[in-house]
Structure formats: structure tokens, C-alpha cells
């Protein structure tokens, strides 16, 4: 039996340096955001993120790390290099540049000694409103310890910019997209395939985009008994009511970052299961302010705190590979 430590983190605008190659359109969109974003500041930002990741999982770091708000593969490789040097592990990357307006992507980093990924079964689904925005990344993993297969789905849904209700239809579209691919995965691989969904959904577990459109529920029993529609069990309901959250806005915590699992992780004979009680929001004094909210790193153009990390807390869980 082996345990796999899985972490998700919104890295808060991990842009490449100000003078890195970009399309003219992206330069126009990011012009103010990149002012003063030097190689030195980027290196400091990466070091801060890696320092926090070094603290999790008994100082061993994650076995698989899902991230969002990463600009491109170049900056992702810089991040990986620092992570590998700090943890003495070798990670591989799953990433593709998407058409997001701000050029920020979803990616996975995974320990190559523990996992293999089927490159023929890696998919990048773009969520489109009036223009392409955000993405969903799907990858088939195989545990090198047990040879068991599972699917990870990373999400970064459209933001609440312009108002929560006004922007909600875009997240409903994202929820429909996730539900479709959850159905498709199970049609192809069978209901027994373990699926772990993670991401920054920019909505909470009880919002309609999650419950009605992504088909994610507080009831494991509903997931197990579902016949025609494959539901997802949302692990973040465990934190509802605890005044905990992953993102702080307008004097309140929000649970925007979430884990969800398919029926294949809930049945008694599941190939992989989430260790009971292992889901956690990772909070260390070094990544939070005195009042307990995330200490963001920011940008020179709008307030820089080089002792900060991100405006989101990471979340983690343990997968039991029996």
C-alpha cells in the first residue's frame, strides 16, 4: 500500500518576466500588469512559492501538483527547476498554452518516479464565452507502484469580475463542460475509473455552477446510486461552516479551490481512494497575514509584497493506492 500526496494551488499571476517574448495582443492586455516584473522579482516569487510547498507532506512536497495562473511553459520550467532543487525530486510537466485572454494556464507537475502519463490521453478543453477564456486539463495517470490508472482533471473557471451574478453564466458553461467530460471519461473507461477533479472554480460548493451544472454534490450516496448521470462528490463540504476558505474577498473567506471525486473513488473496491480526513487547506504562518488571510505576492504595478506568496491557499489530500 502506498500514499500519494496531491496538492492544488492557484499561484496568483505567475507571469514570465516583463521582457519575455509575447504576442502583440498579449503585450497589450498585460501591459500594466507586467510593469516592473523583472527576472529578480520573478525569481523571488518562485522561491516564495517553493518555500511553502517544501513545508507540506512532512517536508517532502507534493507527489502531484496541480496549478493555475501560470503564463507559459518557460516560467513553469523555472518553477519546476526550483522545486526539484529544493525537494530533490524530478517532476515532469503537463501543460499547453491556451487562448485565455490573459495568457494564464492550468498545468500539472508530477513525480516521474511515481507516475507515468499516457500522452495520447491528455486533453485541453477551452471554455469559450465571447472569446476563449480559461481551460480544463484532463490527463490519464498510471501509478508505477500498483500499475493502477486514474484520471486527473484540473480547472480554472472564469472569474467573478464584473459581479458574481453577472459572470455566473460563464461558470455554468464551465460546469457543463466538466460534466460532459466526466460523462465521457466514464463512457470510455467505465464507471470504475477513479477520477479526481481539482481546481479554482471561482464559485463555492453550493453555487449553481457546481451543484446543477457540474453535477457535484455533498452526498456520497447520491454519487454511488446515480445511474444515468455521473455525479461528483465534493470533498470541500467538509470545510463548510468552519469559517475556513482558500480565498479572501470582501471581508469573508470563500471556498473557491476544491476537490471532487467520481464514483470510482467511492466504491468499496475502489482502485484508489481518498484517505479519510486527509483533505486540508494548507495554511502556514509564512503564507498568511496576522488575521489569517492569504498573503499575496502582488505585482510592482499595484502593490508588491516580496514576503507574500499567493492570494489563494493551497489544498491537499492523500490518495491511498492499495
Task: Describe the function of each predicted region.
Residues 1-90, 94-99, 104, 290-293, ...:
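N-terminal, active-site-proximal structural segment of metallo-dependent hydrolase catalytic domains
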Residues 9-11, 37, 42-45, 49-77, ...:
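Active-site beta-strand/loop signature of hydrolases that rely on acidic residues for catalysis
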Residues 22, 29, 152-170:
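Active-site His/acidic residue clusters
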Residues 50, 130-141, 175-183:
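A Trp-anchored, charged/polar loop motif used as the substrate-binding/catalytic surface
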Residues 66-149, 155-158:
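Structured beta-strand-rich core segments of catalytic domains in phosphoester-bond hydrolases
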Residues 74-75, 102, 161-163, 204-208, ...:
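Extracytoplasmic/secreted cell-surface and envelope-processing proteins
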Residues 119-121, 162-167, 208-210:
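A short secondary-structure junction signal
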Residues 140, 184-196, 202-322:
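Metal-dependent phosphoester-hydrolase catalytic domains
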Amino acid at each position: 500500500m502506498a500514499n500519494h500526496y496531491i496538492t492544488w494551488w492557484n499561484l496568483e499571476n505567475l507571469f514570465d518576466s516583463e521582457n519575455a517574448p509575447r504576442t502583440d495582443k498579449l503585450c497589450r492586455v498585460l501591459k500594466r500588469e507586467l510593469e516592473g516584473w523583472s527576472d529578480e522579482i520573478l525569481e523571488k516569487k518562485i522561491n516564495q512559492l517553493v518555500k511553502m510547498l517544501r513545508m507540506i507532506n512532512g517536508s517532502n512536497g507534493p507527489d502531484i501538483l496541480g496549478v493555475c495562473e501560470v503564463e507559459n511553459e518557460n516560467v513553469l520550467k523555472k518553477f519546476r527547476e526550483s522545486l526539484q532543487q529544493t525537494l530533490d525530486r524530478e517532476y515532469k510537466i503537463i501543460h499547453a498554452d491556451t487562448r485565455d485572454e490573459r495568457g494564464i494556464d492550468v498545468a500539472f507537475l508530477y513525480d516521474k518516479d511515481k507516475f507515468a502519463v499516457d500522452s495520447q490521453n491528455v486533453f485541453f478543453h477551452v471554455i469559450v464565452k465571447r472569446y476563449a477564456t480559461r481551460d480544463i486539463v484532463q490527463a490519464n495517470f498510471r501509478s508505477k507502484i500498483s500499475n493502477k490508472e486514474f484520471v486527473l482533471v484540473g480547472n480554472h473557471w472564469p472569474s467573478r469580475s464584473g459581479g458574481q451574478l453577472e459572470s455566473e453564466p460563464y461558470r455554468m458553461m464551465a460546469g457543463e463542460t466538466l460534466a460532459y467530460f466526466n460523462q465521457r471519461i466514464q463512457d470510455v473507461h467505465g464507471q470504475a475509473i477513479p477520477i479526481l477533479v481539482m481546481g479554482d472554480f471561482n464559485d463555492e460548493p453550493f453555487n449553481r455552477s457546481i451543484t446543477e451544472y457540474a453535477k457535484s454534490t455533498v452526498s456520497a450516496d447520491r454519487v454511488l446510486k446515480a445511474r444515468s448521470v455521473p455525479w461528483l462528490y465534493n470533498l470541500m463540504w467538509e470545510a463548510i461552516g468552519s469559517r475556513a476558505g482558500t480565498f479572501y474577498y470582501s471581508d469573508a473567506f470563500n471556498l473557491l479551490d476544491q476537490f471532487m471525486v467520481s464514483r470510482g473513488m467511492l466504491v468499496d473496491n475502489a482502485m484508489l481512494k481518498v484517505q479519510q480526513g486527509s483533505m486540508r487547506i494548507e495554511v502556514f504562518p509564512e503564507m498568511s497575514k496576522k488575521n489569517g488571510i492569504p498573503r499575496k505576492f502582488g505585482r510592482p504595478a499595484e502593490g508588491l509584497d516580496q514576503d507574500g506568496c499567493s492570494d489563494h491557499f493551497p489544498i491537499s489530500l492523500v490518495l491511498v493506492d492499495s
